[in-house]
Amino acid sequence: MSLLSTISSPQDVKRLDHEELATLAAEIRDFLIHAVARTGGHLGPNLGAVELTLAIHRVFDSPFDRILWDTGHQSYVHKILTGRADDFSGLRQRGGLSGYPSRAESEHDIIENSHASTALSYADGLSRAYALRGEDRAVVAVVGDGALTGGMCWEALNNIAADDRPVVIVVNDNGRSYAPTIGGLADHLAALRLAPEYEQVLDVVKQVLGRTPLVGPPLFDALHGIKKGIKDVVQPQGMFEDLGLKYVGPVDGHDVVAVESALRRARDFGGPVIVHCVTRKGFGYPPAEQDDADNFHGVGIIDPATGKPVSTSKTISWTSIFSDEIVQIGSERPDVVTLTAAMLQPVGLGAFAKAYPDRVFDVGIAEQHAVTSAAGLAMGGLKPVVCLYATFLNRAFDQVLMDVALHRQPVTFVLDRAGITGEDGASHNGMWDLSFLQVVPGLAIAAPRDAPTLRAELREAVGDTDGPTVVRFPKGKVAVDVPAIDTVGGVDVLYRSPKVAQRREVLLVSIGAMAATCLEVAERVASQGIGITVVDPRWVKPLDPALIDLARAHDLVVTVEDNGRVGGVGAALAQLLRDADVDVPLRDFGIAQRFLDHGKRDEVMAEVGLAPQDLARKVVEAVAKRQPAIEDDPTSPGEAAPAGERAGEAIGDQR
């Protein structure tokens, strides 16, 4: 029987001796490698946090003591130690184990927001609540060095240090977020890793001077009074202690005994303490340790023996199309610069950074700063392109509104992972941008449907000098090209069904990458003898006025978007038609106003009613409600209507 099979709660970890802990750590690493290889997930961060997590659960009493995992992707070991090892076969699968902490899964999981730099603020609030309620409970916040580049962490540290509350901040310092951590903080932490143990020197001096009558104690006090000056020379940890935080470390994060000892000192101190643990991402798994890009930060299904992907798809991703095009644009325009927030490789800027290293700026996990810095770059005569996951632009809305749009700065935002992302769950879905950006004056939004329109609309956005622009696209592979068969104004027509006598017609407005879905919907609807036209507005803010006349020419308007219905493109089109006195009914299909659980993208799309068969059924029902019974149907009940006019192959062949 393996030692791991005997672990079902943190109490089981507390009874182990040091030799057993080393065995358990090795078994956990082997378990993680094989489990994540089958499902995909965040492998590297968790391999680097094994001993650290073991030590935390030995020193503190979860769930009475609260353990908060910033970002949360490094919580797999925590899940194992709290009785969820048997559930890893369903990791990140529909109805299975979440890839992040989940309050629905366990009482040991406190926060589940996977946006970085938030845990310290939660810790501040929790510790204040326990103090006011008279509860003697410790709060432990585990935060990576990458997350410490986020300003919210420093706002929290400033407040945590104001009172003597038992908050233990564990800095898991692996020198990376997705990529190597950058900036002044990274340099400071690097200095700490290399510095000698100042506290040991101070203890020896205190012991020697303490044995010296009369002169010794006053001399020690004098030396202790200039402690800050000594520390700044010997060990540059003053940045933390100047805030009023006790600092312990640096500690070898892969020595469970050393980490446990440091955590016990921190717990017994009774006030706010930072425990600085130096770890290695991907530790103990050679393929991860040798991966220079991101140490297997996130992997798909891999061969655990080699770390190589089990299958290599030849299909091109949206991100790679963007990556290729922005490099080409950069070669043509030396004024184009790019920014990202600790996501250089994930958002496709690796090639741009290699080609133009002086024109790419990774600002760390600091989206607010990235946006306003981009405004400054634009004011200075450059053309900044800010590249983020769509969900992370939520964090910088005020900067988009006031620092960019108010000043009419031509900043382009490229939002990767827009819409439903799937396996990463609620906080990674990019399903809000089309709604909250609708209220920003002067901002234009493009939603490309395929590779050619992504390339074209990116160029249009970068070439716009009138104000800010946004280009959004989803996670995953690009479907085959969907060429237009016609254009009306600036609107692309993708499909027209044959005119069928006495059948009312539908205008189906497809938003972005929903084009392939909408074409399948159109063919299903047309097979029922209903006339239908599919159009793609390309730019969804502001909407092209050509949509007004198109709507007038149809009896029902339907919008389909991979975004929330509330405040989305459907709502904007409804307002446009009302303002133009167009009295045509409109049905807007999108995502309901709720958070979505993890699962494959197609599974989640089906759950929210955006699968082609469900949309087609709803369109047919909407048409039926608005027309009388048909007397002379030219299509017999068992006979499908003729295929519609559209470019390319049948939709079944495209998928």
UniProtKB/Swiss-Prot annotation:
Enzyme Commission number(s) from the entry: 2.2.1.7
Cofactor remark from the record: Binds 1 Mg(2+) ion per subunit.
Name of the protein in its database record: 1-deoxy-D-xylulose-5-phosphate synthase
Residues that bind thiamine diphosphate: 73, 114-116, 146-147, 174, 285, 367
Family designation: Belongs to the transketolase family. DXPS subfamily.
Subunit structure, as described in the record: Homodimer.
Binding site for Mg(2+): 145, 174
Region (Disordered): 626-655
SUPFAM superfamilies with a match to the protein in the record: Thiamin diphosphate-binding fold (THDP-binding), TK C-terminal domain-like
PROSITE patterns, per database record: TRANSKETOLASE_1 (PS00801), TRANSKETOLASE_2 (PS00802)
CDD domains: TPP_DXS (cd02007), TPP_PYR_DXS_TK_like (cd07033)
Pathway per the UniProt entry: Metabolic intermediate biosynthesis; 1-deoxy-D-xylulose 5-phosphate biosynthesis; 1-deoxy-D-xylulose 5-phosphate from D-glyceraldehyde 3-phosphate and pyruvate: step 1/1
InterPro entries the record matches: Dxylulose-5-P_synthase, THDP-binding, Transketo_C/PFOR_II, Transketolase-like_Pyr-bd, Transketolase_BS, Transketolase_C, Transketolase_CS
UniProt lineage: Bacteria, Bacillati, Actinomycetota, Actinomycetes, Frankiales
Ranges of Basic and acidic residues composition bias in the record: 646-655
Organism (species): Frankia casuarinae (strain DSM 45818 / CECT 9043 / HFP020203 / CcI3)
Job description of the protein: Catalyzes the acyloin condensation reaction between C atoms 2 and 3 of pyruvate and glyceraldehyde 3-phosphate to yield 1-deoxy-D-xylulose-5-phosphate (DXP).
Class in the EC hierarchy, top level: transferase
Catalytic activity: D-glyceraldehyde 3-phosphate + pyruvate + H(+) = 1-deoxy-D-xylulose 5-phosphate + CO2
GO biological process: 1-deoxy-D-xylulose 5-phosphate biosynthetic process; isopentenyl diphosphate biosynthetic process, methylerythritol 4-phosphate pathway; terpenoid biosynthetic process; thiamine biosynthetic process
